[in-house]
UniProtKB/Swiss-Prot annotation:
Cellular component GO terms held in the UniProt record: plasma membrane; proton-transporting ATP synthase complex
Topology of this chain in the membrane: Peripheral membrane protein
UniProt keyword rRNA processing, yes or no: no
Keywords from the named record: ATP synthesis, Cell inner membrane, Cell membrane, CF(1), Hydrogen ion transport, Ion transport, Membrane, Transport
Subcellular location per the Swiss-Prot or TrEMBL entry: Cell inner membrane
Alphabetized NCBIfam families for the sequence: ATP_synt_delta, PRK05758.2-2, PRK05758.2-5
Keyword field contains Zinc: no
Record SUPFAM superfamilies: N-terminal domain of the delta subunit of the F1F0-ATP synthase
Subunit structure of this chain's protein: F-type ATPases have 2 components, F(1) - the catalytic core - and F(0) - the membrane proton channel. F(1) has five subunits: alpha(3), beta(3), gamma(1), delta(1), epsilon(1). F(0) has three main subunits: a(1), b(2) and c(10-14). The alpha and beta chains form an alternating ring which encloses part of the gamma chain. F(1) is attached to F(0) by a central stalk formed by the gamma and epsilon chains, while a peripheral stalk is formed by the delta and b chains.
GO-annotated molecular function: proton-transporting ATP synthase activity, rotational mechanism
Pfam families in alphabetical order: OSCP (PF00213)
Official protein name in the record: ATP synthase subunit delta
Reported function: F(1)F(0) ATP synthase produces ATP from ADP in the presence of a proton or sodium gradient. F-type ATPases consist of two structural domains, F(1) containing the extramembraneous catalytic core and F(0) containing the membrane proton channel, linked together by a central stalk and a peripheral stalk. During catalysis, ATP synthesis in the catalytic domain of F(1) is coupled via a rotary mechanism of the central stalk subunits to proton translocation. This protein is part of the stalk that links CF(0) to CF(1). It either transmits conformational changes from CF(0) to CF(1) or is implicated in proton conduction.
Organism: Histophilus somni (strain 129Pt) (Haemophilus somnus)
Amino acid sequence: MSELTTIARPYAKAVFDFAVEQSEKDKSTVEKWANMLEFLSELIRHDKVQTYLTSTSSTFKLADTVISICSEQLDQYGQNLVRLMAENKRLSVLPAVFNEFKSYVEEYKSLSQVEVISAQQLNDVQQQKIITAMEKRLARKVILNCRIDSSLIAGAIIRTNDFVIDGSCRGQINRLANELRL
């Protein structure tokens, strides 16, 4: 997976820099690029498209097919990206390009994705407390993604790109077991 990220990062950075530069003229440019990349990413993930990517040797035919499928979803710059990536045989990394692009956008907008895994459904008050605490700790706006894992027994695990806070009962039991083994 890290190889895909390494390949995708320069494309994502170039698209992001271009989108930010163009956003001086049109404020919605970054969002438009996010939508184009998301659409391309979903298209490329499709099984039939994956088969077509591996079976077609002509990069021009490949690019033209992808562009014709996307028709209204891509502007001229999006089409140029498809042509460039097809020419370099990199269309299969578009999902990774989209993920990297999202990371650049989040950094640009001072956003952080925070995943909360809890033993039970969190109510709105609990979610707001976590958001407030994480915004204070990270000094940026937080987007909270919650999911339930009953194997935690109680408590929650909070994850960002930089760190993990394990406040789950399962985590405490595991730490206690490790201490008792010493």
